[in-house]
């Protein structure tokens, strides 16, 4: 079924220039909220509709799910078919301030909700100064430059640097748990702060420079903010395949098995040593 995975990422790359070009015309806020309770921008719904149209007819894709949709959409019935889970426009709130955002995709080999262990590929498109796509599959992560026509140019393999350089953590500091705040104080003595409000842009900083990105469980939200199926598990797959580690505070995110489509989870990805230190500092999600 490798051709199905190829077709999905080809479709995402082909749509990327259109997503990027359409952002200026879809900056307005809607009156609606998505299934997770987030206020939607026109760009969120528009990007979701576009990516659904580009992927739902791919032979071998049986299910489509998105952060912007309440439920899974059945689009095929191929034997051994895949589920495609998308965050169509991660960091869409950055559109207003003209900062980076991206598209996150996970491909699972079973119906959703599905555990991290069922991921067969994951990737993201980053709409920054250039448009790039990072894809993890077959035990390898590679980065490509996406042209204005959707054509891709391979930029080579991606491997997480062994020496950490940057860190970025989400959430309000007053909402952090005491154990997590203590861990951050140790980290900030050695690493440089890089946090831009779009998860995928911050994760890409970690892939390039080494370090850690996370959105913790908080006093007011023990499960954190990021959606397991659409955000946490795909980025964990990418980072672990690139030689790093992931955690929800107790275990690898790839061992997480969501029971609800829009379930949230504390999320940490980065260099092995930093994630190991995090796990030691956070014995469970409530400390």
Swiss-Prot record:
Stored InterPro entries: FBPase_C_dom, FBPase_class-1, FBPase_N, FBPtase, SBPase
EC assignment: 3.1.3.11
GO BP terms: fructose 1,6-bisphosphate metabolic process; fructose 6-phosphate metabolic process; fructose metabolic process; gluconeogenesis; sucrose biosynthetic process
Highest taxon above the source species: Archaea
Keywords: Carbohydrate metabolism, Cytoplasm, Hydrolase, Magnesium, Metal-binding
Cellular compartments annotated: Cytoplasm
Residues the record lists as binding Mg(2+) 1: 67, 87, 89
Catalytic reaction(s) noted: beta-D-fructose 1,6-bisphosphate + H2O = beta-D-fructose 6-phosphate + phosphate
Protein name, as recorded: Fructose-1,6-bisphosphatase class 1
């Amino acid at each position: 079924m490798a051709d199905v995975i190829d077709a999905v990422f080809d479709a995402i790359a082909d749509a990327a220039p259109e997503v990027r070009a359409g952002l200026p015309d879809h900056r307005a806020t809607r009156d609606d909220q998505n299934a997770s309770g987030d206020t939607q921008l026109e760009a969120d719904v528009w990007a979701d509709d576009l990516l659904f149209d580009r992927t739902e007819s791919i032979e071998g894709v049986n299910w489509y799910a998105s952060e912007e949709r309440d439920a899974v959409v059945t689009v095929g019935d191929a034997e051994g078919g895949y589920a495609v889970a998308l965050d169509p426009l991660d960091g869409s709130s950055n559109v207003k301030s003209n900062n980076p955002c991206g598209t996150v995709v996970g491909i699972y080999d079973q119906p959703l909700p599905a555990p991290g262990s069922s991921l067969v590929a994951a990737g993201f498109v980053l709409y920054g100064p250039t448009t790039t796509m990072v894809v993890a599959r077959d035990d390898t992560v590679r980065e490509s430059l996406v042209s204005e026509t959707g054509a891709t140019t391979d930029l080579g393999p991606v491997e997480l640097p062994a020496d950490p350089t940057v860190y970025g953590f989400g959430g309000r500091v007053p909402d952090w748990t005491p154990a997590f705040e203590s861990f951050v104080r140790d980290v900030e003595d050695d690493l440089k702060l890089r946090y831009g409000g779009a998860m995928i842009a911050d994760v890409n900083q970690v892939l390039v420079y080494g370090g850690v990105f996370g959105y913790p469980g908080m006093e007011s939200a023990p499960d954190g903010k990021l959606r397991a199926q659409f955000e946490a598990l795909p980025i964990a797959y990418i980072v672990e395949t690139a030689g790093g580690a992931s955690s929800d505070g107790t275990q690898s995110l790839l061992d997480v098995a969501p029971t609800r489509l829009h379930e949230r989870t504390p999320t940490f990805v980065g260099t092995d040593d930093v994630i190991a230190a995090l796990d030691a500092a956070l014995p469970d999600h409530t400390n």
